Design a protein with these regions (language model features):
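Sec-dependent signal peptide recognition
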Residues: 2-8
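Bacterial Sec-dependent signal peptides at the C-terminal "C-region" and cleavage site
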Residues: 8, 12-21
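Cys-dependent protein tyrosine phosphatase-like superfamily
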Residues: 18-175, 187-288
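Ser/Thr-glycine-rich phosphate-binding loops at phosphate-binding pockets of nucleotides
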Residues: 180, 184-185
Length: 288
C-alpha cells in the first residue's frame, strides 16, 4: 500500500470543508504529503495546490507570506478572477496563466438561470449545477473536460508556461490554483508529480483526494438530482463539476500512454520539457 507523509503542523495543510460560507482556502494541500520513490519525497512547504484565495484567512495569508511564497499561479479566466479576486500575499508575484477547458459551470447556465440564482456566487452556482445536470451540453463537458485539459493545444501551451515558471523559480514556495482547485489544478499537479518521478498510483491518489474535500456537497446535490428523476448520467455531471471524475481522469492517462508511450514522453512532447528541465525540478524539490 502506498505510504503518505502527513505534515499537519499548521492548519492550512488540512482539508477545508466545502460550506455555504467558506472561511479559509479550500482544497489546499502541500505536495510533500507524497512519497515519490525509494524514500524520496517532495520538500515540505515548497509546492502547494489549492482553490482560489479570495476567502483566505489572515492567518493563512500570513503563513504563505512567511514561507516565503515566491509565486501565486492562477489558472482562472478573467471573469472568474473578477468575481473572486485572490487576496494578496505579501512578497509573492501573481501570475495568471488562464486555462479554458470549457468546464466553466456558469457557461452551461442560461441567462435566466444566472439571474434567478444571483450570478456567479459560489453557493448559488451549486443550485445551477443541479438544474444543468439534465443539459446535454453539460453532460458533454463533464465527459470531455480532462481530455481537453490534456490534449487541447491551447491547454498544453498553458501548462508548458506553468512549467517554465516553476523552472525559473530558484527560491521560495509556489502556490498554484484555479477556482475549486480540482480540474485545471488537478491536471497541473498530475503533470508536476509525474515530472518529479511519482508513480501512477500517487498521481491518481492526489487527484482523487479532491472528492474527500467536496464529498458532502457531492452527496447533497446528487440526491437532489435523483429526486428530480436524474440517473447516473445526470449524477455524473454533479460529480464532475463539484468534485472530480477519477475514472475519466484515469481514462485520459491511459490515452496518453497509448498516444505517447508514457506520461514522461508526453511531458517531453507537447509540454516541451527537456531532460535538463526535469533534472532541475527534481534537484530543487526532491529530498530523501
Amino acid at each position: 500500500m502506498k505510504q503518505f507523509l502527513l505534515f499537519l503542523s499548521f492548519p492550512i495543510l488540512m482539508f477545508c470543508s466545502c460550506t455555504k460560507d467558506p472561511k479559509g482556502i479550500v482544497n489546499m494541500r502541500d505536495l510533500s504529503n507524497y512519497i515519490i520513490a525509494d524514500s524520496l519525497h517532495i520538500r515540505q512547504g515548497m509546492l502547494f495546490r489549492a482553490a482560489h484565495l479570495a476567502d483566505a484567512t489572515d492567518d493563512e495569508i500570513q503563513y504563505l507570506a512567511t514561507l516565503p511564497t515566491t509565486k501565486i499561479i492562477d489558472f482562472r479566466l478573467e471573469d472568474e478572477k473578477r468575481d473572486r479576486a485572490d487576496r494578496v500575499v505579501h512578497g509573492a508575484e501573481y501570475i495568471n496563466i488562464p486555462i479554458d477547458a470549457s468546464g466553466n459551470v456558469m457557461a452551461q447556465a442560461t441567462d435566466e438561470e444566472k439571474k434567478k440564482f444571483g450570478g456567479n456566487k459560489r453557493f448559488d452556482l451549486r443550485k445551477i449545477i443541479v438544474m444543468i445536470a439534465f443539459n446535454d451540453k453539460a453532460k458533454k463537458v463533464a465527459r470531455e473536460i480532462y481530455h481537453n485539459l490534456f490534449f487541447n493545444s491551447d491547454c498544453q501551451a498553458q501548462y508548458a508556461h506553468f512549467f517554465r515558471e516553476l523552472i525559473a523559480t530558484d527560491t521560495g514556495a509556489i502556490l498554484y490554483h484555479c477556482t475549486q482547485g480540482k480540474d485545471r489544478t488537478g491536471v497541473a499537479s498530475a503533470l508536476l508529480l509525474a515530472a518529479l518521478g511519482a508513480d501512477r498510483e500517487t498521481i491518481i491518489a492526489d487527484f482523487d483526494a479532491t472528492n474527500a474535500v467536496y464529498e458532502a456537497d457531492i452527496r447533497k446535490y446528487s440526491r437532489r438530482v435523483r429526486f428530480f428523476g436524474g440517473k447516473e448520467d445526470e449524477v455524473a455531471v454533479v460529480k464532475a463539476f463539484i468534485g472530480v471524475n477519477t475514472d475519466n481522469f484515469i481514462r485520459e492517462l491511459k490515452q496518453i500512454d497509448e498516444q505517447y508511450g508514457s506520461i514522461e514522453n508526453y511531458l517531453k512532447g507537447p509540454i516541451g520539457l527537456t531532460d535538463d528541465d526535469i533534472n532541475t525540478l527534481r534537484k530543487r524539490y526532491i529530498i530523501k
